[in-house]
């Protein structure tokens, strides 16, 4: 055998082995189903070096707090037209295509929305479930809450998203009732909420700490959200029946979005826990 033919044989063998190794250890295109499993996490204090929280846009982590929208680094005042996202990197198997089973999930978090004492402020934040590769939509500041593109915001079939919105400014698609100028709502593929309730933000003292609990029951298919302000005697709740299989992909990520527009406020998440079982 000549030297050149031996080298060719060695090269071909190397390519074969490399391809075999790659086929064994390459990442799958999507997570593998695991029926009967439970996924949970609990974050008591946010860490800017955490590998599990992915922030986009203007969202940042500082002093243990997840700040969804931006403030001026010198004055600390909130900035106009700020948009941000924060998602947990763990994929959530929200329903199973083979069996048709739906997951139950529950989440709770503490938050502060600071209006700086202004009667006019905006625009709010959301807790959402969306596709694994969901990104910040273009032009999603203001009333679109960092979650919807203005062109498709009212077309439910275009948005595989379910969210609980904490809306602090009334837009044209929001409830007309003065009692719901600030409100919480359930969004199913659209910024036009399918169910809303009063959120007493404007009667709260500055920097009031809110506690939110969101649950989904796979049997009743009821999505429920409750907000309480301990020690202040203010609470609210909203619910809606929705089959998540008709809206969401099989695998989702969970997280928060927020936005300011011409009007401003701050949106801070203090802690967060989540659990899902399929």
Swiss-Prot record:
GO terms for molecular function: carbohydrate binding. Induction: Accumulates in roots during colonization by arbuscular mycorrhizal (AM) fungi (e.g. Glomus intraradices). Pfam families: Lectin_legB. Glycans are attached at residues 116, 139, 271. Disulfide bonds: none annotated. GO terms for biological process: response to symbiotic fungus. Keywords: Glycoprotein, Lectin, Signal. Residues 1-23 form the signal peptide. InterPro entries: ConA-like_dom_sf, L-lectin, Lectin_LegA_CS, Legume_lectin_dom, Leguminous_Lectin. May be involved in arbuscular mycorrhizal (AM) symbiosis with AM fungi. Belongs to the leguminous lectin family. This is Lectin 6.
